[in-house]
Amino acid sequence: MQTSLSANRILAGAIACVTSALNLFATMCSDGIDDFLRRLKESPPGAVFNPWWQVDKENDADRNAPAIRRRHLRAYLRKRLGSVKLVVIGEALGYRGGHFSGIPMTSERILLGKKKNDGIKPEHVFSSIKATRTSNCEECPDGFSEPTATIVWGSLLRLGREPQEFVLWNAFPWHSFNPRRGMLSNRMPTQKERSAGMSALKTFLNLFPCDKIVALGNVAASQLKELNVEFHRVRHPASGGAKLFRQQIKKVMNDLC
């Protein structure tokens, strides 16, 4: 009886230690994400939109939009902490994607469950909260759809990756737009703007340490090279690059297995 009681005490103590360690890890991870979100406040001036901390007065549904996008991003990142085997870095947020979803290379239609025919479900992105659209319904009744988002998510999922095993981000984390065309436009960030995004990119890579990093296109490759990070460069799927992207990302994924 005495031996049984001692064993139970040891087991209970071990469980308590493991639980305490897991709680500490979760707290540290949560703190890291919150610190990262605060770092994203530091967007450069000019024709740059910060979806997590600014309101798009012309196209947002209401003034709660930035807080909603922060919740989306937080849930997306938390789902992947400690599980990522592949990091994919794009160029910059697009107005059809992260501008309204708050998540790189992810459209509102993905979050709203309107890309299931492409094999992409909202729970692939996150499942801890319910997604909410932030764009007003007048401009795009079904929510915005971004071709790059659909191609990247669809390709990675079809190649058998679990959604929490890969994380998508951008070399320039904010949305650079054409000031003459307005918020609903995209442009390549300038070198000065890209330099302003380096700190956020470095912090992101520290949050998700990973041996396999993929750069979509030349801007992402240039930023990663400046950080002395090893990476695989693949064709960006935009502007007719979808076929080559799928071929190249498949090779990278095969090497990962």
Locations of the language-model features?
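A polyanion-binding, active-site-adjacent surface
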Residues: 29-212, 222, 227, 232
